[in-house]
UniProtKB/Swiss-Prot annotation:
A Gene Ontology molecular function term of the record: sodium:proton antiporter activity
Stated name of the protein: Na(+)/H(+) antiporter NhaA
UniProtKB keywords: Antiport, Cell inner membrane, Cell membrane, Ion transport, Membrane, Sodium, Sodium transport, Transmembrane, Transmembrane helix, Transport
Taxonomic source organism: Brucella canis (strain ATCC 23365 / NCTC 10854 / RM-666)
InterPro entries: Na/H_antiporter_dom_sf (IPR023171), NhaA (IPR004670)
Subcellular location per the Swiss-Prot or TrEMBL entry: Cell inner membrane
Segments passing through the bilayer: 23-43, 58-78, 96-116, 126-146, 155-175, 178-198, 201-221, 224-244, 265-285, 298-318, 334-354, 367-387
Gene behind the chain: nhaA
Main location group: membrane
Length: 393
């Protein structure tokens, strides 16, 4: 039976959307906006009750933040390994500019936050919240410019965001770890060792790695180290090279898994996280929250700290000859991308949830992240759009 062009058109439009670079960011924005609407609607109580509903040993919110997000971190780990061994980060010259820029973008926001909250140890726990960049959001905004943004800028932003994610993973593992259970931690190390041995022995079937990854998650979760770290550790053990002597299957296990996870993470995992965590009820919320040093520290850290930290470090690296400016990109365009780095959404909220147990502080964190990310997205897009306009005359 032949389908008419009219009936096929919606399918092709949807397929083009899912394949576009902007799709993940747009879906995440829609999920966050929907969460804000629901949290301030007659369905608000149902929304919050559902998140606190216990399913087995954990609430729904904890299943999302501890288990579902481990899949997100598994994909992050796969991307980091691929880029470090066989991509944009495979050589030191390619690592220099995004690496130095990422360092500036982690350090300056943390300093701004610490200056505003140095006298409050409870708030100071959130120093790392404004140090993250949301790769899906940032690339989604940049991709809205299409061919008007040089491809070198997209590579720079993607590479910087991956290094940013790596820094966030290290920060979570070191600074946001609860009391350690040595038996579970020991079991986690043994499981990681099994994964490593499988890699060295040339095991290329994904199933043993995935089963071991689930076991690793269980042990890490119970050890006190944040469970999402298990996703990254498991990813680093997945083989990058395809099976030897198999000309019919030249795709490596890492590429297979990365390809299989890309769309589910972009369109299911991250939007669910966004919907579950972006819901802020403004009912009874005092205006003073906006002026609180916790909210301001995150907002200014993301909006000002990120752009000045990333651009300042990149400018210094280029001017001193340590790195080269992205090909075909102007200084204004590089600055616009630096502003986009202030879109911290997913990782910033995630670190905020680890930092603060109180609902009020989590709400202030989310307001700071949402406002700082929105300002960065709007200003970065407008500057890049203006910089891409053809000059008249």
């Amino acid at each position: 039976m032949n389908h008419s062009p009219q009936s096929a058109r919606p399918v092709s439009i949807m397929r083009r959307f899912l394949d576009s670079e902007a799709a993940g960011g747009i879906t995440l924005m829609a999920a966050a906006a929907l969460a804000l609407i629901v949290a301030n609607s007659p369905f608000a109580q149902t929304y919050f009750d559902a998140l606190h509903l216990y399913i087995g040993p954990l609430s729904l919110a904890h299943w999302i933040n501890d288990a579902l997000m481990a899949i997100f971190f598994l994909l992050v780990g796969l991307e980091i390994k691929r880029e470090m061994l066989d991509g944009q980060l495979a050589s030191w010259p390619n690592r220099m500019l995004p690496g130095i820029a990422a360092a500036g973008g982690v350090i300056l926001p943390a300093i701004i936050f610490a200056v505003l909250n140095h006298d409050n140890p409870a708030k100071l726990r959130g120093w790392a919240v404004p140090s993250a960049t949301d790769i899906a959001f940032a690339l989604g905004v940049l991709s809205l410019l299409g061919s008007r943004a040089p491809s070198s800028l997209k590579v720079f932003l993607a590479t910087l965001a991956i290094l940013d994610d790596l820094a966030a993973v290290v920060i979570i593992a070191i600074f946001y770890t609860a009391e350690i259970s040595m038996p579970y931690l020991g079991a986690a190390f043994i499981t990681a060792a099994v994964l490593f041995v499988m890699n060295r022995m040339g095991v290329v079937k994904l199933l043993p790695y995935l089963i071991s990854a689930v076991i690793l998650w269980f042990f890490v979760f119970n050890s006190g180290v944040h469970a999402t770290v298990a996703g990254v550790v498991a990813a680093l053990m997945i083989p990058l090279k395809p099976a030897p002597g198999r000309p019919d299957d030249m795709t490596s296990p890492l590429h297979k898994l990365e390809h299989a996870l890309a769309k589910p993470v972009a369109f299911i995992v991250v939007p669910i996280f966004g919907f579950a965590n972006a819901g802020i009820s403004f009912k009874g919320l005092e205006a003073s929250v906006l002026g609180d040093t916790l909210t301001l520290g995150i907002l200014l850290g993301l909006f000002l700290g990120k752009q000045f930290g990333v651009f300042g470090a990149a400018w210094l690296a280029i001017k001193t000859g340590l790195a080269e400016k992205p090909m075909g990109a102007s200084w204004v365009q590089l600055y616009g991308v630096a502003i986009l780095c202030g879109i911290g959404f997913t990782m910033s909220i995630f670190i905020g949830l680890l930092s603060f147990p109180s609902d009020l502080m989590q709400t202030e964190t989310k307001i700071g992240v949402l406002s700082g990310s929105a300002l960065s997205a709007i200003c970065g897009y407008l500057l890049l759009r203006a910089a891409a306009r053809p000059k008249r005359g």
